[in-house]
Every structure is written in C-alpha cells, then in structure tokens.
Amino acid sequence: MKQLKEIAPEKPFFVYYVPGATHAPHHPTPEWIKKISAMHLFDEGWNKLRETIFANQKRLGIMPDNARLTPWPKELPEWDSLGLEEKKLFIRQADVYGAYLAYADNEIGRVIQAVEDLGELDNTLIIYIGGDDGASAEGMLNGTPNEFTTFNGVDVPVKDQYLWYPFWGSERTFPHYAAAWAWAMDTPFKWVKQVPSHFGGTSQGVAMSWPGHIGDVGGIRRQFHHVIDIVPTLLEATGISAPETVNGIEQRPIEGTSMLYTWDKANATAPTRHTTQYFEMLGNRAIYDNGWVAATTPATRPWELSTATPPDVISGYKWELYNVDEDPTQFNDLAAAMPDKLKQLQDLFYAEATKYDVLPLDNSTLSRWNTPRPSLTAGRTEFTYSGELSGVPASAAPGTLNKSYTISADVEIPAGGAEGMIVTEGGRFGGYGLFLSKGEFGVGRGKIVFLYNLLDLKRTMWEGPELEPGKHTIVFDFKSDGKGLGTGGTGVLSVDGKEVASNTMDHTIPVTFPEDESFDVGLDTRTGVSLVEYRYDSPFKFTGTIDRVTFRLGQ
C-alpha cells in the first residue's frame, strides 16, 4: 500500500488480505501461544465456552434475547465426561488455535494501522469477514498433531498425541483441534464446516467501517446476506459499474445484492434485500427464502472419514424447516408441522439449483476427493527420470499407494563418496525417500537408506552399506500384502543385484501423501522424511550423478 501511494498517490487502492488463519494447520508464533495460554480461556472446556459465547452474543446484541442455544450433539463428548489427560491435551489444542486467531487479528490490525499512517483511514471502506465457513471438525474426535492422519482415516489416540504436546503449533506439527471445539466455536448454531445446510457451517460475523459514510457507528444489523454481496456493495459504494467484458470475454451477471442500504440507521430493522439463496456441499443443502430455511439433515459426520456408501442423494435425506426471522439459531424444526411450506422451499431449492448449475448433486466424499482425473500419469505403470527434477505434484508422480512397486536407481559415486536425495515424495508428515547419508557428522562415503514415513507416526528404515566410488544400481522392491487401503508389505533393498536389507510394514499410507509436499529427483525441495536418524536439511542435493531412476508399479 505504501509503495502504491508513493508511486501513484492520486490513485485509489484495493486490498484483498486473506491470512491462512485459522485454517488448519494452526501455526502461530511461540509468543502468541504463551500469551493465550496464560489467559486460560479454554480451561473450563467446550461446553462452558459455548455458554459463555452465547451469553456474550446476547449481551452485545448480536443475538436477540429470545434466541435459544441449540442442543449439544450426542455424538460429541461432554467436557465433564473426559479424563484429566484428555482435558490437558484438548486445552493445549484450543490454546494454539486461539493463539493463531489472535496472531492473525494482530496482523490485520497492522494493515489497518498502515492505512491510518497513510492518512487514508477516513477515506477507506473496510469490510472484515470473520472466516470463510464454519469451524472445522476435521480434526476428528481427538484432534491431531498431523492433519494428514485425518485425511488418511487415522484417529490418533490421546496418549500417543502427548509425544507432540511440547511442540504443538510448531513446525514439528501440522495440528488441528478436536471436533467438539469446532461445534463450540460455531455457537449458537448446529453443525460445522462441510455442512452448509445449517448456519453452523456458513454463518460468519461481518464488520464494516467507512467514516463519514456509515452513520450508525457500532450498530448491529441482522439482515440475511451472503458473501456474493461483497462485490455489489463495493460497486455501489464506489460508483463503479461491473464490466460487461474482461479481456474480451463476456461476463456473467453479478448475482449478489448490495448491503449499502443497511448503513442507514433508518434501515436497521428493514427486511433483507437478499431474499433467496441456495447452499450445497457434498449433498448437504439448504434454501433461504424471505426468512425461512429448508435444510437437509446431514447423513454423515464431518469428523468421520466414512468409506460407507452414502444414501441416495435425493431420496435419502430428511429435511428440516426453520423460520429464522423468529428462530435465528435454527432451534425449532417446523417440518412436521408445516409440510406444505417445506415442499414449497424444496421445490425452490431445485429451481435455484437448476438455474445456477448445481445439479447433478453428488454426496460422495472420499471417492470424490480421490477420484483419478485426466493426467499425464493416469494408467501408466512405468516411469523413468534422468537427472534432477523438483516440485512435481502427487497427481503427476508415480502412484505408489496401495500397491506393489519397484524403484530402481542407476547412480555414479565420485571419489570420496556421495550423499543426498535420490528420489522422494512427501516429507515430515508422511512420505518416503531413497538417499545416501554420511550421518550427522558428514563422514564416510555415504550409506544407502530407504525410509518410509507413516504419517509421522512411525518410520521404517532399510539401511545398506556405504557405496564405493563408481557406478551402482540401487533397487527398492516393495511387495504389498494384498488389496485394500493402507495394507502393509515387505520391502527389500538391493545394491548391484545383492540384497542388503529387508523389512516389513504392517501399514502404509492409504489415501494421500501430504498435499503441500512434492515428488523430487536428485534433491528434496520441501521438508525431510527423516526426523532423528539420518536427519538432513533440505534441499539435500545428491552429490553423485543420477543416470536414471525408474518406477515400476504393480497392482
């Protein structure tokens, strides 16, 4: 912003600032963790937190006095039912989350302070949105030090998570909190992220500031609006018309509704001008229309990675009905009492879904996320690489999950030995690596190692000898125990046709390697797969010569 004002001080600026907080992983700075932990905000647990939040919402006028707190779900544990070990861990999870939120708020404050330092605060419209969906329950029932365990259907027991307790929130973890915290964070509503049928999965607080233009400073507005209303609000506020074409491409109409009318105190209780809105995700769906909401009851729980066949996406869902003008928390389901109203809104949902290309509906989860898509690697069983290669996404890498495979590397070792990565996929939170290591002190000629990292829960190693100068063929051959997700197997490491190590794994990664890692040949561009033994620092370039690396994939 400062540079823009220095280069072209007469021009207005637009800033879209979107920090990662508080999407998992929760990674605040240690200073913020210390500050929030010292405040003991979460020590009384999620049920008490929910009551406190709801009381504050009523005190501040965010929720009307007649609003009712929705019931706690039976699928999530009550705080008082937990043991001391569980409570201690869950408090730590929430403290790190709270620190991440406070850290982000502080940085947002710095941005606003910079606007004020430029002398432009009174001339700047600020729209602050407190999130992009409901709080996430994807940490499963116990939370996790590594969210990729969730994506692979692994629920890490509380006692095992204590290994990461001192490091929670640091680069040693990829953490998320327990699902019950998510439900509490969505107070007073039901449900969480992934469930757009209910306000717990969609409702966000919004604050707007524009001195001299918004007269009712500190005023509360309860009109229904949607994120698609942000652009129309900006266009009306600035007097700019939406472009009909961009780079020669005709633009679709803006479907949202400006919120500018709500700035007038006379319109504080006026009916919303955004009268109808559909919601849909993973088969969960709802329709808002003039103060009424019809919504499906979720068929699955977002804190469970279900492999079961989902119900029929049309006929397999129960519907609920709410008058949210009178019942803003969606407490009182009127579906049984008002079937005609429900039917009217159901028909409206399908009309809107047709209009806005929502159909066909799809309520699959794991299969939808992990569906093979058109790619250069689909259907291939052999891959050959020569020389250094980096940053290849998993979708374009050899797919070694849930099958037998062979990795063969032809390398040349110089005089004095070599070290470095030959080939790797994944990293600290799950993956594998074939590399040469001179150990912690960098001595020797370089020992050949294959390391498999099972989601940072267990590492299995195959260790061979130091390689003499000259040409060598290194082979790692893995035979899977059978079909199915995450099955184990036996791996054999060979050098120049001679077996040098054999080991077994009871389990392998079933669904996905970490999405923020990559497949690399000749170096490791992201985090390392090792932790203590054979630890290395990226990029860990191979100091010998790679002639060829070949993958052969089985069934």
Indicate where each model-derived feature is located.
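Flexible glycan-contacting loops in extracellular carbohydrate-active proteins
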Residues: N503-T543
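Glycan-recognition/cleft segments
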Residues: M421-V449
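Short, aromatic/His-centered strand-loop micro-motif at the edge of beta-sheets
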Residues: L454-T473
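Long, internal low-complexity/basic segments
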Residues: L69-W72, S81-F90, I230, A294, ...
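Localized edge beta-strand/strand-to-loop motifs within extracellular or lumenal beta-rich domains
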Residues: E468-G489, R552-G554
